[in-house]
Amino acid sequence: MSVRRTLITISAVSLAVVAGVLIAPKIGEVGHTWTRVSAGDKTWLLAAVGLEVLSFVGYVVLFRAVFVRTESRIDWRESYQITMAGLADTRLLAAGGAGGVALTAWALKRSGMNGRTVTQRMTSFLVILYGVYMAALFVDGAGLATGLFGVHASAAVTIVPAAFGGIVIVSALLMARLRPVSVAPAAAGDERGFRRRARHITLSIAAGVRGALELLRRREVGLVGAIAWWGFDIAVLWASFHAFGAAPPVAAIVMGYFVGTLANTLPLPGGVGGVDGGMIGAFLAFGVDPATAVLAVLSYRAIAFWLPTLPGLVAYFQLRRTVGDWKAEDAAVEPEPVPVAAPARVAIA
C-alpha cells in the first residue's frame, strides 16, 4: 500500500471512529430506526428518488462532454451503459471510485480510443468532477467559518474543510504549469522505479488539469453535469431530511455531505459504515437532532446506493455485449492479408 493510500485510510478510519464515539451515546434515542425509515413521508422519499435520477443524468452529460468530442462509437446508449456500470462498480467496491475508473477506461479503449487519450481525458474528467467538490468545500467552509451563512459550528467542519479544499485547488493549478522534460536515456535508466512512477503520475495529473481548463475556456456546456451530479445528490439528502421532519440549513447539509463522502476512500463495500458515520458525525457537530440525522442519512444511503446498483449491474452486462459487437465490427473491417508471390527463379544457363 502506498504512503498516500495509507494516509487516506488512516484519516478515513479516524473520521469513522470519531463519528462512532459521537453517535454511540445517542443510539438509544433513535429507537426502531428501520421501522421509522419506512414510515417517512412518501412524497419526499419519491422526490429524493427523482433527484437521484437527475444526478445520474448530470453524470452522463459530463461524461459525454469530456470523452465524446468528435465522431465516436459512443452514443447516448453506450454512454449510459459505461457510466451506470461504472457507478455500480463504485457503489459496490467504494475505494474512492477506483473500480469505476478502471471499468470506464477499459470500455473506452475497447471503443477504439487510444490509451494516452483515455488517460488524459479520464484525468480531466476527475479533475472537473472533484474540482467542483473542492470548490464546494472551500466556499461552504469559508462561509460557515465567517458566519456568512448564519450557521455556527466547530472549526473541524468549517475551517479545516475550507483549508483542505483551497490547498487542493491551488496545488492542482500549480501542477498545470508542469511540462514534460526531455531526459537522456542514461539518466532515464538510472531513475528509480518509485521516482519514475511519481513523475509519470504527476505529469498525467498536470495534463489532465490543463485539459479541464481548456474545456472551461471553451465554455463547454456539458460541464454543468458536474454541478448537477453533486447538486442533485445533495438534494437527495435534503429531501430525506424533510421526509422525517425539518431539514437543517442548506450550508450544513452541503458540508455534512462532503465531509461524509470523504469516507468513500475506504475499501469497504459501498463505503458501508464509513460514509454513514462520517455524515452523521458531521451533522451532530452542527447540532442536528441525532434521531433525525440517522434516519435521513440511512434513507439517503439506501436511495443513493441501490438506485444505481441494480440498473448498473444490468448495464454492465449490456456493456459487455456492446464491447463484443465492437470487437466483431473491428474483425470484419480488418483487411485480409494479401499473399505475396514468391520471387521467380531465374535459370542461368
Each language-model region and where it sits:
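Predominantly cytoplasmic-facing regulatory/coupling regions of multi-pass membrane proteins
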Residues: 1-84, 143, 147-264, 295, ...
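Membrane-interface alpha-helices at helix entry/exit sites of multi-pass transporters
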Residues: 77-81, 95-101, 110-127, 287-299
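Transmembrane helix-loop junction
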Residues: 68-69, 91, 110, 242-243, ...
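Membrane-embedded alpha-helical segments of transport systems
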Residues: 89-93, 116-138, 163-167, 295-311
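Hydrophobic alpha-helical transmembrane segments in multi-pass integral membrane proteins
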Residues: 267-271, 277-301
